[in-house]
């Protein structure tokens, strides 16, 4: 949900750290008014490579009064990608905008039973939150935008159970790749939202040219792509093709 709420570092006020030489320091300030270089942000961004956190002071965010989760499905991946760009261009900032392509849907649906349409080229998960009137208005606008870009259906989760099932599929995506192949190579890249459709089309071309399989599941709202090249490392020569594809994608 970093599209609306920001990444982890935005919610960490201070952190007590043990550095590699054993020194214990506090980075940031619990009252959120530390001066100088943002060493707290650098440490959080280092994802564990700069030391060990022993205490963390975080900023808590109040739960919104209204939350709605939408599921849109498309015949074309480009339609889902273009919908994301159009939603943001319309001034709507959802809490989350996530896309899963058909291979991902086929892998997760048998386990989570979220009701993802197996014949869809892509599904788009949209989460909205805020005041009830604002959420209702955003739902209506997104339905219009999605339909204009080829959405076959726009489904609004009816209750918390349905919301949880829709999200369980997204959160289970990486684990479900074992259904397809035992190994994977992950690219973690960021591109402009306006080029999502173009870049995804090229990713599929690169994979097809090398006779490989890719599964796309990603944070579409901020253009953060995670092309998962899945393969069996026991296959002779496959690693070379995978690495070549990964380099070309990046």
Predicted regions and their residues:
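C-terminal substrate-recognition/cap domain of FAD-linked oxidoreductases
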Residues: 58-62, 68, 73-245
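FAD-binding subdomain of flavoenzyme oxidoreductases
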Residues: 1-98
């Amino acid at each position: 949900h970093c599209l609306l709420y920001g990444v982890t570092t935005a919610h960490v006020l201070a952190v007590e750290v043990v550095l590699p030489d054993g020194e214990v320091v506090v980075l940031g300030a619990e009252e959120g008014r530390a001066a100088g270089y943002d060493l707290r942000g650098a440490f959080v961004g280092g994802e564990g490579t700069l030391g060990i956190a022993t205490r963390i002071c975080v900023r808590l965010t109040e739960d919104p009064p209204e939350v709605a989760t939408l599921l849109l499905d498309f015949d074309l991946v480009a339609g889902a990608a273009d919908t994301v760009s159009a939603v943001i261009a319309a001034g709507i900032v959802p809490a989350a905008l996530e896309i899963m392509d058909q291979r991902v849907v086929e892998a997760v649906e048998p386990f989570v039973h979220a009701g993802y349409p197996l014949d869809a080229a892509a599904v788009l998960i949209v989460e909205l939150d805020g005041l009830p009137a604002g959420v209702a208005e955003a739902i209506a606008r997104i339905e219009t935008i999605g339909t204009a870009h080829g959405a076959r259906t726009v489904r609004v989760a009816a209750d918390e159970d349905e919301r949880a099932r829709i999200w369980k599929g997204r959160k289970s995506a990486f684990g479900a790749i074992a259904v397809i192949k035992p190994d994977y190579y992950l690219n973690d890249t960021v591109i402009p939202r306006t080029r999502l459709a173009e870049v995804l089309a090229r990713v599929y071309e690169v994979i097809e040219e090398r006779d490989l399989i890719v599964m796309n599941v990603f944070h579409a709202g901020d253009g953060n792509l995670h092309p998962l090249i899945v393969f069996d490392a026991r296959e002779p020569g496959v690693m070379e093709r995978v690495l070549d594809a990964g380099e070309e994608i990046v």
